[in-house]
A protein has these predicted regions:
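Non-catalytic helical/linker scaffolds that mediate oligomerization, partner binding
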Residues: 1-563
């Protein structure tokens, strides 16, 4: 079976690398997430981030109040309206993360070779000799002489002088006496503690996480919950139960794999989660440096085979303080794309970085170049070999057969675009799973789902959630606009032509169900149609919000439009 390293199609010649790119307006297929914070929360900066390529906004509740994050989200909504660009929202939990408590206002200076004690006594003030931590007890954690401990600022890069590596010398009850391995000054918004090989038995959701989900998440109909320090599939079940209890049944769960326990149970986690985040910062503390690439490639491949979108963190840390990445960082970003990553999640670069917008532009540009070299056909064949054959297989349901056929047809005719009509977004995810070389325009058609006396409106959340899927551009259809007659397809092509996704004469693949129009409402066989842009009448010279399709909006917007 093909493996990750074969998904690279080299350029025709080294000289071709020097040629100027022909079309810089086409966005990268790889999705780009940004951690929003002090340097990236104004309307102006958020507008620039959206234009630069941000598709996922991460609100990290490891720090900051609900009021602070609400103000940032309100600004993001204004920025989305102003730019007419969609962006999905992600609530990142604190989980069982350990932090330093009772910090003084002044930074804490530490010297290599000195003794530093970690204590679970929460009444002690943090100082140069002792750090109180938020974990209740060291008993049963596996902490022992020789254990390695890392203490650093929130979203540490590893290159700053505000992090310290400790070696445990002695464990006495709930205190661990350590030796500092390096000199540093501990500072930053929050100090996190990472103990290698620790058995962390704290609840997967902290009390603050429960409040954030039930209040902030429910009020804002958040699209994803990113579950920090996911240890097993049971942890995902816990957060799903909480989401269901507060009316967030449509919210999806992204499992963050960032410790050894999560690595051990990665197979079950990938199967249970809706998507996966490979947190290389924290996982890199638990693994030897020479083993990190193995974990990365295996996890990416597992997610690819399962059809679960996977994002990766910690790519261009240098750009937190510098306007350009290192050559190694640039190569790393490209290799992530070639290894099968669906998205990149930026942390300190956009949270506190001096060059947030430039970072997004740079990473997107690197991703676009890597996508040009991605061997889509070899990747497609590797998935089909995994399922067993090129025809309908027991492992391939109707939707997956339709999705894989659409991607294969697009490759055969060199299509410029795949159009998918969907209610739930499921078919869009399945098409994206096969990583076609062209974009996927997903028309999300709102629908009402009935469960007894409970009615749920589908559409708005599903459209935003599609922003996490590689190559997918979702647009909303007006609920009052009916599908028969193919008019909505004409509008979809008109929009694609307006934004430069297709030109006259381009081939387009359309995936839909002939009876309902939706490709994921399949009580009968779906259809893959091959069309040419010129074959369809363009209903109007310009797309506006008066048309039945538009890129951004909420159900409130739709209701106002129809008044």
């Amino acid at each position: 079976m093909a493996t990750n390293h074969v998904f690279f199609e080299p350029p025709k010649s080294l000289l071709s690398i020097l040629e100027e790119d022909k079309d810089l307006s086409v966005p990268a297929l790889t999705k780009l997430g940004c951690t929003l914070g002090p340097q990236s929360r104004t309307v102006e900066v958020l507008e620039d981030l959206l234009r630069a390529g941000m598709t996922v906004a991460r609100f990290d509740f490891s720090w900051g109040s609900m009021e602070y994050h609400q103000e940032t989200l309100d600004n993001l909504r204004i920025a989305m309206r102003n730019t007419k660009r969609l962006c999905c929202t992600m609530l990142d939990t604190m989980g069982p993360e350990i932090i330093v408590l009772n910090r003084p206002e002044a930074p804490i200076s530490l010297t290599a070779g000195q003794t530093l004690t970690l204590t679970c006594n929460k009444s002690v003030a943090a100082s140069e000799t002792v750090l109180p931590i938020s974990y209740p007890s060291l008993a049963g954690t596996g902490l022992a002489p020789g254990s390695q401990v890392f203490v650093g600022q929130y979203l540490f890069t590893g290159s700053e002088t505000s992090s310290v590596y400790l070696t445990v010398q002695e464990v006495k009850g709930d205190e661990a006496v350590c030796t500092c391995n390096n000199t540093c000054i501990l500072e930053g918004l929050a100090l996190t503690v990472h103990i290698a090989h620790m058995r962390n038995e704290a609840p997967i959701l902290a009390d603050s996480d429960m409040s954030a989900i039930r209040q902030w998440g429910a009020a804002n109909k958040i699209d994803y919950v990113c579950l920090s320090f996911t240890r097993n599939a049971a942890d995902i079940g816990v957060v799903r139960a909480v989401l269901d209890s507060c009316g967030l049944e449509q919210t999806r769960v992204m499992a963050k794999i960032e410790n050894l326990e999560g690595l051990v149970h990665a197979g079950d986690i990938v199967e249970a989660a809706d998507s996966v985040l490979l947190s290389r910062g924290n996982l890199g503390i638990c693994l030897d440096a020479e083993k990190m690439f193995l974990a990365q490639k295996k996890l990416l491949r597992a997610c690819n085979l399962a059809g679960k979108p996977v994002m990766v963190t910690r790519v261009v840390d240098t750009m937190t303080d510098a306007p350009r990445p290192t050559r190694a960082e640039a190569t790393d970003v490209a290799n992530l794309v070639l290894d099968g990553a669906d998205g990149i999640l930026l942390g300190s670069e956009t949270f506190r970085g001096k060059y947030a917008v430039s970072t997004v532009k740079t990473v997107c540009a690197i991703c676009k170049q890597a996508e040009l070299c991605f061997d889509n056909q070899s990747y497609y064949r590797s998935l089909m070999e995994y399922f067993g054959c090129y025809t309908l297989h027991p492992n391939l349901g109707k939707r997956e057969a339709l999705a894989s056929s659409a991607v294969r047809a697009a490759a055969k005719i060199n299509a410029a675009l795949i159009i998918v009509f969907t209610v739930t977004g499921q078919t869009a995810r399945l098409v994206a799973k096969y990583k076609p070389a062209c974009p996927i325009l997903t028309v999300v058609c709102p629908d009402i789902k009935s469960d007894g006396l409970k009615w749920t409106l589908l559409g708005e959340v599903q459209a935003r959630q599609c922003m996490l899927y590689r190559g997918v551009l979702p647009i909303m259809a007006d609920p009052d606009f009916s599908l028969p007659g193919g008019a909505i397809l004409d509008y979809a092509i008109a929009y694609a032509k307006q934004v430069g996704m297709v030109r006259s004469g381009d081939k387009v693949v359309v995936s839909q169900c002939p009876r309902t129009g939706y490709s994921d409402v399949m009580e009968e066989a779906g259809v893959v149609k091959l069309i040419t842009v010129d074959d369809h009448v363009i209903p109007g010279s310009a797309m506006t919000f008066n048309h039945p399709l538009f890129v951004i909006g909420s159900m409130e917007t739709l209701n106002k439009q129809n008044d």
